[in-house]
């Protein structure tokens, strides 16, 4: 396998690790990156790769938040942390909309909406939403300042926003759920953390489905490319998550909104020009 393919896998892992957690759409960036950095692999492998590489990103969440995610303590025998168990139930409730609809209609939605026009439009729409919501919430105190204060109703409503991201590429799963949280009165840090945790079952489920569809029939180079991408995505995700949590403790999400709008315009102009030129 050529070194250039390894370098491409590293670049794709970096893009995944950054864009999966910042609310700027990993799909939007992957579409652009794939336009210029194409791995010399089959179309079936690349479809699977762009989803399963997320396992590296999700393992970063598990590592960084293990104490909050683990419902068991072993100080004096095994005991259960009721608050953590309840949080997991809320995560499950939040996953229901995207989980059910995604399983039934995933291929249909991909066929209808997986194109640069949808990606560009959703980048811009949710970019505007971030700016509008942050301006609206300016000076207001959030109602939810701890994960335990998220109700089952709020969790389900955040799940509806995740469903929007599942249907329309370019929305950004993290962007949609954070927007949903902010609209529902959840603080920035809690909305971000809940988004991270919500990704665990979603990404594991999506990766499992893609692996089953691919059939685990890896060649040696394919397996190496996938592992390299996942490891790099894991390392970069750790850095990205720490950066985001530090940033939003002192700042709002408007900078990400402006970035999304600019990127959406770039995607729209670039692919429109390419289509016209042929």
Curated annotation (Swiss-Prot):
It is found in: Cell membrane. One of its GO terms (cellular component) is plasma membrane. It holds the Pfam family BacA. It comes from the Bacteria. GO terms for biological process: cell wall organization; peptidoglycan biosynthetic process; regulation of cell shape; response to antibiotic. Its main location: membrane. It is a multi-pass membrane protein. It catalyses: di-trans,octa-cis-undecaprenyl diphosphate + H2O = di-trans,octa-cis-undecaprenyl phosphate + phosphate + H(+). GO terms for molecular function: undecaprenyl-diphosphatase activity. Its EC number is 3.6.1.27. The chain crosses the membrane at residues 2-22, 44-64, 85-105, 113-133, 150-170, 189-209, 223-243, 253-273. Keywords: Antibiotic resistance, Cell membrane, Cell shape, Cell wall biogenesis/degradation, Hydrolase, Membrane, Peptidoglycan synthesis, Transmembrane, Transmembrane helix. Bacitracin is thought to be involved in the inhibition of peptidoglycan synthesis by sequestering undecaprenyl diphosphate, thereby reducing the pool of lipid carrier available. PANTHER family: UNDECAPRENYL-DIPHOSPHATASE (PTHR30622:SF3). Belongs to the UppP family. NCBIfam families: PRK00281.1-2 (NF001389), PRK00281.1-4 (NF001390), PRK00281.1-5 (NF001391), undec_PP_bacA (TIGR00753). Catalyzes the dephosphorylation of undecaprenyl diphosphate (UPP). Confers resistance to bacitracin. This is Undecaprenyl-diphosphatase. The gene is uppP.
């Amino acid at each position: 396998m050529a070194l250039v393919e390894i370098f491409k896998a590293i670049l794709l892992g970096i893009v995944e690790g950054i864009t999966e957690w910042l609310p700027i759409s990993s799909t939007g960036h992957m579409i652009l990156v794939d336009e210029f950095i194409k791995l010399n692999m089959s179309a079936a492998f690349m479809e699977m790769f762009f989803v399963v590489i997320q396992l590296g990103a999700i393992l970063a969440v598990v590592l960084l938040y293990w104490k909050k995610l683990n419902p068991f303590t072993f100080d004096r025998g095994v005991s259960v942390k009721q608050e953590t168990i309840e949080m997991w139930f809320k995560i499950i409730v939040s996953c229901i909309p995207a989980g059910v609809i995604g399983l039934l209609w995933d291929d249909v939605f991909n066929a209808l909406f997986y194109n640069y026009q949808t990606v560009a439009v959703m980048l811009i729409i949710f970019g505007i939403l971030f700016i509008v919501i942050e301006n609206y919430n300016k000076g207001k105190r959030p109602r939810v300042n701890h994960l335990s204060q998220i109700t089952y109703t709020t969790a389900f409503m955040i799940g509806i926003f995740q469903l929007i991201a599942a249907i329309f590429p370019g929305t950004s799963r993290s962007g949609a759920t954070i927007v949903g949280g902010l609209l529902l009165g959840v603080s920035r840090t809690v909305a971000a953390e809940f988004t991270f945790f919500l990704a665990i079952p979603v990404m594991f489920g999506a990766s499992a489905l893609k692996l089953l569809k691919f059939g685990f029939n890896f060649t040696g180079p394919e397996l190496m490319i996938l592992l390299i991408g996942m490891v790099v995505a894991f390392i970069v995700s750790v850095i990205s998550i720490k950066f985001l949590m530090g940033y939003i403790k002192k700042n709002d999400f408007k900078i990400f909104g402006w970035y999304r709008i600019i990127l959406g315009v770039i995607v729209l102009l670039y692919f429109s020009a390419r289509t016209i030129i042929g």
